[in-house]
Amino acid sequence: MAASTEQATGGVEKTAAEEKPRVLEPGAAPFGNFPHYSRFHPPEQRLRLLPPELLRRLFPQSPETRPILGLDVGCNSGDLSVALYKHFLSLHDGETCLDASRELHLLCCDIDPVLVERAEKECPFPDGLTFITLDFMNQRTRKVLLSSFLSQFGRSVFDIGFCMSVTMWIHLNHGDQGLWEFLAHLSSLCRYLLVEPQPWKCYRAAARRLRKLGLHDFDHFRSLAIRGDMASQIVQILTQDHGMELVCCFGNTKWDRSLLLFRTKQATETHPIPESLIEEGKERNRIRFWRE
């Protein structure tokens, strides 16, 4: 997340003792908008946990369910967005598919215009992924841009939302109420939601890096009441406050972050998750159910 282009590129003011600006170390960007995120959190770590057939199983083929519409919030420079697109369509490196955009279309947003511009330039599937600059916490802009995209397909909500390592940055910059509102907006916009919350140790590390570099501390860090086991906190907010149901946890990444799949009660009634997917996941030990 970023508030300005200067912050997005990691620039800081020069001092008398410095001729060049310091460069933010990975993870120290105040809004999570570091320029080479995928170098230290590669997409493959998430992909190995997610069944490639997940979306096809959740949304069986029919005119009403195509294309599957996804919302990727906090897409950074698009590396993970593209990787997810290829993964769920079973596309290999260098491979294209003329019908890909008819099967799946992702709207990917980030607050940093520099990162969004890079994502647009490097995207190998311009017909299937749309990148926009958006401060998701700006209600007016969010409503206009997302409604405009959905109306192109005659839809009012997204089939699935992706919130990958974003919740901490919302929480640190907007406080407890901001996190609650962020999850409320997502749950109202998406029938299914895949969330990768950062654990509390990442909060402490992010704050420590800012202090180490002499940057302004996060306004809300010391006053946050929602803390501790952040995966459980996210589950509680989405299920108890926002009417979603936790379907499963696909496991943890190498850097110890859970991949949690939620669905709205309406989705539960109209499109129950296939039992075959559940059983296959259990057999592969890739899906751990929180209710067990």
Curated annotation (Swiss-Prot):
InterPro entries: Bin3-like (IPR039772), Bin3_C (IPR010675), BIN3_SAM-bd_dom (IPR024160), SAM-dependent_MTases_sf (IPR029063). S-adenosyl-L-methionine binds at residues 46, 76, 110, 135-136, 164. One of its GO terms (biological process) is negative regulation of pre-miRNA processing. Gene3D superfamilies: Vaccinia Virus protein VP39. It is found in: Cytoplasm. The keyword Coiled coil does not apply. Residues 1-22 are annotated as: Disordered. Keywords: Cytoplasm, Methyltransferase, S-adenosyl-L-methionine, Transferase. Its main location: cytoplasm. Its EC number is 2.1.1.-. GO terms for cellular component: cytoplasm. GO terms for molecular function: O-methyltransferase activity; RNA methyltransferase activity; small RNA 2'-O-methyltransferase activity; tRNA methyltransferase activity. Residues 53-274 form the Bin3-type SAM domain. It catalyses: a 5'-end 5'-phospho-ribonucleoside-RNA + S-adenosyl-L-methionine = a 5'-end (5'-methylphospho)-ribonucleoside-RNA + S-adenosyl-L-homocysteine; a 5'-end 5'-phospho-ribonucleoside-RNA + 2 S-adenosyl-L-methionine = a 5'-end (5'-bismethylphospho)-ribonucleoside-RNA + 2 S-adenosyl-L-homocysteine. The keyword Transferase applies. It is an enzyme of class 2 (transferase). PROSITE patterns: BIN3_SAM. Belongs to the methyltransferase superfamily. Interacts with DICER1; the interaction may be mediated by RNA. O-methyltransferase that specifically monomethylates 5'-monophosphate of cytoplasmic histidyl tRNA (tRNA(His)), acting as a capping enzyme by protecting tRNA(His) from cleavage by DICER1. Also able, with less efficiently, to methylate the 5' monophosphate of a subset of pre-miRNAs, acting as a negative regulator of miRNA processing. The 5' monophosphate of pre-miRNAs is recognized by DICER1 and is required for pre-miRNAs processing: methylation at this position reduces the processing of pre-miRNAs by DICER1. This is RNA 5'-monophosphate methyltransferase. It comes from Bos taurus (Bovine).
